[in-house]
């Protein structure tokens, strides 16, 4: 598993509970840095497990230099300072909670580009559906999605842009380790299929945020910067495999569908 993280592409550690995923991730991060294959690893773990994760990491590497977040670090008055510590510090690993990870935004420009890409794909799908007989429901569904994305884009463009916000791109992170990655399974999805059990087209903001950050890491690492770990990669929905493909390979949704 460690060798795959070092020399392969984006990795999914889908071992059962107790199999040693935490140690695999810690060893991977330390070896990546020792070999000069990455500069900074960010561990995103369940909020209540940040200290436990740090303890496990130090049990394997007692002299590792870690930066571990606390609840106070992401309070409004402290967030910028903590993000600056991530950006300027030389750490073997930075460990933060899931909800704290969401509070570190991608740049507005990158968010706008991702939304526009989704809108372009929907526009193409609408034209294809209009050309086919009996796809009236699909067209309506896609137009609803397009409207929702337009509103999202308009809100983003109208938001105040503060120059002092530290964005995810500015952290200097080039490896992302995500524990309990099944929490990010509800991703943007459009499909012609209807009345299929377990087929959900709803999207969670945290999943959308994760997708954008994975896309960024793919760009700067050549598709080697994302390592997910979970004991339940697919639990109860047929769309979860689709989501995995999007997060780990980052093609367009239409490429995956084809």
Where are these regions (language model features)?
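Short regulatory helix/loop adjacent to the ATP-binding pocket of P-loop NTPases
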Residues: 238-244
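Conserved pre-motif I regulatory segment
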Residues: 1-12
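Single conserved hydrophobic/aromatic residue that forms the stacking wall/gate
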Residues: 248-258
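The start of beta-strands in P-loop NTPase/AAA+ ATPase cores
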Residues: 9-11, 92, 174-175, 225
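P-loop (Walker A) phosphate-binding loop of NTP-binding proteins
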Residues: 16
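SF2 helicase/translocase NTPase motor core
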Residues: 19-214, 237, 254
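Conserved helicase ATPase motor motifs in RecA-like P-loop NTPase domains
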Residues: 224-235
């Amino acid at each position: 598993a460690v060798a795959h993280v070092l020399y392969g592409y984006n990795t999914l550690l889908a071992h059962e509970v107790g199999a040693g995923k935490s140690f695999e991730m810690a060893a991977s991060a330390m070896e990546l840095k020792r070999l000069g294959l990455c500069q900074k690893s960010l561990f995103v773990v369940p909020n209540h497990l940040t200290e436990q994760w740090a303890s496990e990491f130090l049990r394997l590497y007692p002299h590792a230099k870690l930066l571990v977040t606390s609840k106070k670090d992401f309070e409004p008055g402290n967030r910028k300072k903590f993000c600056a510590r991530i950006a300027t510090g030389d750490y073997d690993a930075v460990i933060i909670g899931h909800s704290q990870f969401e509070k570190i935004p991608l740049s507005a420009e990158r968010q706008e580009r991702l939304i526009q890409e989704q809108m372009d794909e929907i526009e193409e799908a609408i034209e294809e559906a209009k050309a086919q007989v009996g796809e009236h429901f699909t067209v309506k569904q896609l137009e609803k999605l397009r409207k929702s994305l337009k509103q999202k884009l308009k809100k983003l463009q109208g938001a105040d842009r503060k120059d002092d916000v530290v964005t995810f791109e500015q952290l200097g992170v080039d490896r992302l380790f995500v524990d309990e990655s099944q929490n990010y399974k509800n991703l943007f999805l459009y499909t012609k299929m209807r009345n299929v059990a377990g087929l959900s087209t709803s999207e969670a903001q945290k999943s959308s945020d994760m997708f954008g950050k994975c896309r960024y890491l793919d760009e700067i690492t050549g598709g080697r910067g994302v390592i997910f770990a979970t004991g339940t990669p697919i639990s109860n929905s047929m769309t979860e495999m689709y989501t995995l493909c999007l997060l780990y390979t980052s093609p367009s949704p239409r490429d995956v569908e084809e």
